[in-house]
């Protein structure tokens, strides 16, 4: 039993949706121990002594996870160690094992020297002030002490079987699977093959150095190899997973990148066809076309804040059956558990495409599309980013448009929209624009440019 007092941990690692830092600098083995103590204490306070723990394929994983588990055990928690698995497999463990708490040690798509913690306590994904509360527990030494236990649990076969039994493929497909040397490589290619597809694996060996490309399918440059392979192999589809497998990137048979909001169009159509009136949630970065489409299918569109933890909370509150974020997190509550799961989402996509006579390019090109910018980032400071947004919400003049201020400022005009919001994870302002003509796109950009300059004339506006 440890009665030692914790060192002061850097405040910077306690972020909006998770805890994340640079290994050996802001995040050490000792830090992992005390974070384990805080999470264990919080879980026990909520009446949950059982905690599942997993880790991704990062090089720092084994050392950090050992200390994380020790911290949980020293609280008196019963730990189920599920080993090296994708994040959704850890979430799955926290749904189907005895306990409803779980900690995933993962750096997601950050560079190799990062690691972090995604945390579920008693069925709730922690965010914002709940993550700050863990830091306060450590500072106040408000920590449980006890003698817990650790059990190794092989959860992968159970997860594998549940998805395999859930998905019905109408015909086999040829799929290129790029795991970017992330932890999805331990299951995604094998599972997709078990569904009846022929799989061409790309970078599916787990390697925490990420020697081939960064495991972030949200950036087009990381999909170059996948696109080339899909074309060379004449494949039906390309799938790319991020470093911890909770996001998926999609490429059609002709090499077109399908952005997550367009993926959500297909998923919404499918889910609402069986569940008329279902709520479908999407974040403020998604296309305006989703709103009319979801309504047209007979569903109820719900726009919400960006952030996987925040979306999960909103799903619980609304009873939504499906949610998606522009970052690539997709959450199925229909036939699944409601957590973000890149691997399950990929399987659902294959099921839908297998039932369609058209190729994937034609399936997606049938949906309406606008001209859009990629995500534009303006570097500011941690302190100024929220102040700028507050000033824009308070003072800016946007003209004739529908203004949404639930996360930054989004203005929907008759023929397009613009968004400016503060990133919750980095000191940047995030912007995105979309319109049905180039002229309208430029007009909306000009409005936003002028309003930003009015708030702070020194701001760089790279658009």
From Swiss-Prot:
Segments forming a coiled coil: none
Pathway membership: Nucleotide-sugar biosynthesis; GDP-alpha-D-mannose biosynthesis; alpha-D-mannose 1-phosphate from D-fructose 6-phosphate: step 2/2; Bacterial outer membrane biogenesis; lipopolysaccharide biosynthesis
Triggers of expression: By D-mannose 6-phosphate.
Record-listed E.C. numbers: 5.4.2.2, 5.4.2.8
Phenotypic effect of disruption: No longer expresses O-antigen LPS side chain or A-band LPS, sensitive to serum, resistant to virus E79. Has no phosphomannomutase nor phosphoglucomutase activities. Does not make rhamnolipid.
Region (Topological domain 2): 159-255
Dependence of activity on temperature: TM is 66 degrees Celsius for phosphorylated protein and 62 degrees Celsius for unphosphorylated protein.
InterPro entries, per the entry: A-D-PHexomutase_a/b/a-I (IPR005844), A-D-PHexomutase_a/b/a-I/II/III (IPR016055), A-D-PHexomutase_a/b/a-II (IPR005845), A-D-PHexomutase_a/b/a-III (IPR005846), A-D-PHexomutase_C (IPR005843), A-D-PHexomutase_C_sf (IPR036900), A-D-PHexomutase_CS (IPR016066), Alpha-D-phosphohexomutase_SF (IPR005841)
GO process terms (BP): alginic acid biosynthetic process; GDP-mannose biosynthetic process; lipopolysaccharide core region biosynthetic process; O antigen biosynthetic process
Catalytic activity: alpha-D-mannose 1-phosphate = D-mannose 6-phosphate; alpha-D-glucose 1-phosphate = alpha-D-glucose 6-phosphate
Cofactor, free-text remark: Binds 1 Mg(2+) ion per subunit. Zn(2+) can substitute, but yields a catalytically inactive enzyme.
Domain of life according to the entry: Bacteria
Keywords: Alginate biosynthesis, Isomerase, Lipopolysaccharide biosynthesis, Magnesium, Metal-binding, Multifunctional enzyme, Phosphoprotein, Virulence
Subunit structure as annotated in this protein's UniProt entry: Monomer.
Family: Belongs to the phosphohexose mutase family.
Entry domain remark: Consists of 4 domains; domains 1-3 have a similar toplological core while domain 4 folds over and closes the active site from a hinge region. Mutants in the hinge region (residues 262 and 368-369) generally increase KM for glucose 1-phosphate 2-fold while reducing kcat about 10-fold.
Miscellaneous notes: Most crystals have Zn(2+) rather than Mg(2+) and are catalytically inactive.
Role description: Highly reversible phosphoryltransferase. The phosphomannomutase activity produces a precursor for alginate polymerization, the alginate layer causes a mucoid phenotype and provides a protective barrier against host immune defenses and antibiotics. Also involved in core lipopolysaccaride (LPS) biosynthesis due to its phosphoglucomutase activity. Essential for rhamnolipid production, an exoproduct correlated with pathogenicity. Required for biofilm production.
Name recorded for this polypeptide: Phosphomannomutase/phosphoglucomutase
Species assigned in the record: Pseudomonas aeruginosa (strain ATCC 15692 / DSM 22644 / CIP 104116 / JCM 14847 / LMG 12228 / 1C / PRS 101 / PAO1)
Gene encoding the protein: algC
């Amino acid at each position: 039993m440890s009665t030692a007092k914790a060192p002061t941990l850097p405040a910077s690692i306690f972020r909006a949706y998770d805890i994340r830092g640079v290994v050996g600098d802001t995040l050490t083995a000792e830090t992992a121990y005390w974070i384990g103590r805080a999470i264990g204490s919080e879980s026990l306070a909520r009446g949950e002594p059982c905690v599942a723990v997993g880790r991704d394929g990062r090089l720092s994983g084994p050392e950090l996870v050992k200390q994380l588990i020790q911290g949980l055990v020293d609280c008196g928690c019963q730990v189920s160690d599920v080993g090296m698995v994708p994040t959704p497999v850890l979430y799955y463990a926290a749904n189907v094992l005895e306990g409803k708490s779980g900690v995933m040690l993962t750096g997601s798509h950050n560079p190799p020297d990062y690691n972090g913690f995604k945390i579920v306590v008693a069925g709730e994904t922690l965010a914002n002030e709940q993550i700050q509360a863990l830091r306060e527990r450590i500072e106040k030494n408000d920590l449980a002490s006890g003698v817990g236990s650790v059990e190794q649990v092989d959860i992968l076969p159970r997860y594998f079987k549940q998805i395999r039994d859930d998905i019905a493929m109408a015909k086999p497909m040829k799929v290129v699977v790029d795991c970017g040397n992330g932890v999805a490589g331990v299951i995604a290619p094998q599972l997709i093959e078990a569904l009846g597809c022929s799989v061409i694996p790309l970078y599916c060996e787990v390697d925490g150095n990420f020697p081939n490309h960064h495991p972030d399918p949200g950036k087009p440059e990381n999909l170059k190899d996948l696109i080339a392979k899909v074309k060379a192999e004449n494949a039906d589809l390309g799938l790319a997973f991020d470093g911890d497998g909770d996001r998926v990137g999609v490429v059609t048979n002709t090499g077109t990148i399908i952005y997550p909001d367009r993926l959500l169009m297909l998923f919404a159509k499918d889910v609402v066809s069986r569940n008329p009136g279902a709520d479908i949630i999407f974040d403020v970065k998604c296309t305006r076309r989703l709103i009319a489409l979801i309504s047209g299918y007979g569903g109820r569109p719900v726009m919400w804040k960006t952030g996987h933890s925040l979306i999960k909370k909103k799903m619980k509150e609304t009873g939504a059956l499906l949610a998606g974020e522009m970052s690539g997190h997709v959450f199925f509550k229909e036939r699944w558990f409601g957590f973000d799961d890149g691997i399950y989402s990929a399987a659902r996509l294959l099921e839908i495409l297998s039932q369609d006579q058209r190729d994937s390019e034609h399936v997606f090109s049938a949906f309406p599309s606008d001209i859009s910018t990629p995500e534009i980032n303006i570097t500011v400071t941690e302190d100024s980013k929220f102040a700028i947004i507050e000033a824009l919400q308070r003072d800016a003049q946007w003209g004739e448009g529908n203004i949404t201020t639930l996360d930054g400022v989004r203005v929907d005009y008759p023929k397009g929209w613009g968004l400016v919001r503060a990133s919750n994870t980095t000191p940047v302002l995030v912007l995105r624009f979309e319109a049905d003509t180039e002229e309208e796109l430029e007009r909306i950009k000009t409005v936003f440019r002028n309003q930003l300059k009015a708030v702070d004339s020194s701001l760089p506006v790279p658009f």
